[in-house]
Amino acid sequence: MKKKIKIITDFDNTLSTVDLMDKLMVKILGERGEEIVSDWESMKIGAVFAHKQIAKNQKLTNELIREAAKEVGIEKGIHELLGYCRENDIALIVVSDGFDVYIDDVLSRNNLSDLPVYCNETVLINGRMEIRHPFGSNECDFCGHCKDKTLD
């Protein structure tokens, strides 16, 4: 049996025109957010730690995340790529360490909501935002989403 070809894409700064996670860190946490982004990008800290820092801030809400997402577009050529994939029975899949609420929002606004998405989840519990990592690894908590495991 022939295996189906899959194209896997990240979301932040790959499918989208900016890294919305970085923008949220800075918008919500200010200078501390800039430090976290810098430490994250230099791999001094992992996504799980960064997510915990943003989630413990009272300002984080789905509405704030959606508001920030309004400024985000998608890269040129994505619709053409999706058309090519559909014509040739190739799966285009989004695998991200970002949050469902902004990924879903940006994809929906750009008529891409039918793409399969594997990402972290934001949930409101007792009035506080919690970030869940359904695709994390039990062996490592550096990344919120262990993309290697998702690709298996």
Walk through the language-model features, giving the residues of each.
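Conserved acidic, metal-coordinating active-site core of Asp-based
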Residues: 110, 115, 119-152
